[in-house]
Amino acid sequence: HQPLPAAATVISDVRCTDAFDKGKGRGAIILLETVLTDKATGDKLCTMDSVLFARGDGGYGGPQGSPDALPQAPIRPADHVVEFQTLDRQALMYRLSGDRNPLHCDPDFAAAAGFEKPILHGLCTYGHACHAVVRTTCDYHPEKLLSFSTRFSAPVIPGDMLQTHIWEEEEEIYFTTSVPEKDLIVLSNGFATLDI
């Protein structure tokens, strides 16, 4: 709704907008809407829509639909390709954001969850992609970014090189982020809108 202030006390109001039952043993999809409001002024700062996949929580008898179709990048070479090298210790540094999930720092916990080693926080990968879009399409003017969304497709391991492919279609931006040495798409169906 407006640029986020550098300092503010915000109120976060989260509500479930929908849920889809994928069936017993197949999970459920939960749609959430979060509205951030400046406590001092009452002004809406932003609205965030999230789609969560709840593994093992299907089969409860709810509707079996699915979220809206995801945006697709144009079928042509990307207008921009941006690379970011993540650091081997990046997940440990990113814990300063307050996410203390042991999946990002404990090798035994990560192995028990089925990963070869601790994985990078999804929000960190998301931030790298957002930085790439703001850098290439907004010339580092984040206030021009009106919306930003993507689908988390695969985990990133700290130390992976991230490569973000960006397509510009006037005020609409499409992007994907990959780990090229693994031939792995980690963020798919990326879509952003700009105030141009």
Give the role of each language-model region.
Residues 62-64, 71-140:
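Hot-dog-fold acyl-thioester-processing enzymes
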Residues 2-81, 158-159, 163-196:
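HotDog/MaoC-like acyl-thioester-processing domains
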